[in-house]
Regions:
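Short, gly/Ser/Thr-rich active-site loops of penicillin-recognizing serine hydrolases
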Residues: 309-310, 323-325, 358-376
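Short, conserved catalytic-motif segment at the N-terminal edge
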Residues: 31-86, 108, 169
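Bacterial N-terminal signal peptides
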Residues: 10-20
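Short, well-ordered beta-strand elements
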Residues: 329-330, 338-357
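Short, surface-exposed loop or secondary-structure junction motifs
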Residues: 66, 73, 125-335
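Boundary at the C-terminal end of the N-terminal hydrophobic targeting segment
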Residues: 24-26, 32
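Bacterial N-terminal signal peptides that target proteins for export
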Residues: 2-12
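Short active-site loop at a secondary-structure junction
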Residues: 48-54, 76-134, 172-185, 264-267, ...
Length: 376
């Protein structure tokens, strides 16, 4: 082989390397800027004086980066890691909305189906006409549980819930499909509809139709034991956080289940920042997944009920229109847990925040972190 060939080949490689170097530098510079933004916002919210800890996952530039602060269990000095398991609280509603979207895409149910089609025991004048679509978009008119007396305690039964729904009369000016009112009761009812339609528990539906196809192996919808703790194997329970109040008081044992009654459609799902990073990839087009599941995820994000110029409701997700960017997100919280998922689909950008304390200020992701990264 002639010497000129090697010289020519070396010259080509040198030129290519010069072209790639700026791209590599730009990517590393972008990563550093993202880390600076996230760290500067999150670190002050999870100091040594704050209760519990915080796990975050940021999807940007086609990759997931993790940020960890504080303790999963302060007494045991067990630190938070990307694999620590947190209670997702109302983030679970995203998964139930995805089940509805999957069923719609497969022709198994319709958004305009009345809930009484699947639960004929619902015969009240108002509730019998509420639709699946109204439940999943918080437009049914049903309220938060504390506004639906008699509600609730651990002896509150399914029969009492159905009786309450049949007796329900919306207040003046409220009607199914006419307003957006955030409701746990609506999602408890949605869970019952899904279980009746598919003749299987909601945990099995979520596991078989969403978690397994996405490869989310550290996300669980456990049954609740007699001690109100999640029933999970010991090796899994060792990864679960101790929950704290916003003042730092431990609330319940690790894995404790807070439920409005024995049908926990309002929450009770455990996952890690690493597993929810997989969900971020799927939601933002960064993973190869089943086309039907991709279509369902995209369907859940579509705004279906504009509330005002700044806010709109999708299927579980909320749309927040800020200057120059629209954030699609879902917060969740209990008195000992806080969770948040936020997306900027236009920039293929997303964030997960998981905290083992009540009242964590997740708004910093919506109003500060996501807009700042979106401008890079």
């Amino acid at each position: 082989m002639q010497p000129w060939f090697f010289l020519r080949r070396a010259a080509v490689l040198f030129v290519v390397s010069l072209a790639v170097l700026p791209l590599v530098h730009a990517d590393s510079d972008m990563d550093a800027q993202i880390r600076d933004i996230v760290t500067s916002e999150l670190a002050p919210t999870a100091t040594a004086s704050d209760p519990g800890g915080l796990a975050a996952a940021v999807y940007a530039g086609g990759q997931v980066t993790f940020f960890n602060y504080g303790f999963a269990d302060a007494a045991a000095k067990r630190p938070v890691t990307p694999d620590t398991l947190f209670n997702l609280a109302s983030l679970r509603k995203i998964f139930e909305a995805t089940l509805v979207a999957l069923g719609t895409g497969r022709g198994e149910l319709r958004l305009d189906d009345p809930v009484s089609k699947y639960l004929p025991e619902l015969h009240g004048d108002t509730i019998s006409h509420v639709t699946i679509g109204e439940l999943v978009t918080h437009t049914s008119g049903l309220l938060l549980p504390t506004d639906h007396p008699p509600w609730p305690n651990e002896t509150f039964t399914r029969e009492q819930f159905i009786a309450m729904l049949n007796a329900w009369t919306p207040p003046a000016g409220v009607a199914p499909g006419k307003q957006r009112i955030y409701t746990h009761a609506g999602y408890v009812l949605l869970q019952l509809v899904l279980e009746r339609r598919y003749a299987m528990p909601i945990a099995t539906l979520i596991e078989s139709r969403i978690l397994q196809p996405l490869g989310m192996t550290s996300t669980f919808v456990p049954a609740r034991g007699k001690d109100n703790r999640a029933i999970m194997p010991p090796e899994i329970m060792q990864r679960v956080v101790q929950g704290y109040s916003d003042q730092g008081t431990p609330i319940g044992a690790p894995g404790s289940q807070q439920s409005y009654y024995d049908f926990p459609g309002t929450g009770q799902m455990f996952s890690s920042a690493r597993d929810l990073g997989i969900l971020l990839r799927a939601l933002l087009g960064g993973a190869v997944i089943d086309p039907a599941l991709r279509a369902a995820l995209e369907m859940t994000e579509q705004e279906s009920f504009p509330v005002d110029q700044k806010f709109g409701q999708a299927m579980a997700w909320e749309h927040v229109r800020l200057d120059g960017v629209t954030v699609i997100d879902k917060p969740g919280g209990l008195n000992n847990a806080s969770a948040y998922v936020g997306l900027v689909p236009a920039r293929r950008l997303g964030i997960v925040l998981l905290a083992n304390r009540g009242e964590y200020p997740h708004e910093i992701a919506r109003y500060r972190i996501l807009p700042a990264i979106a401008k890079l």
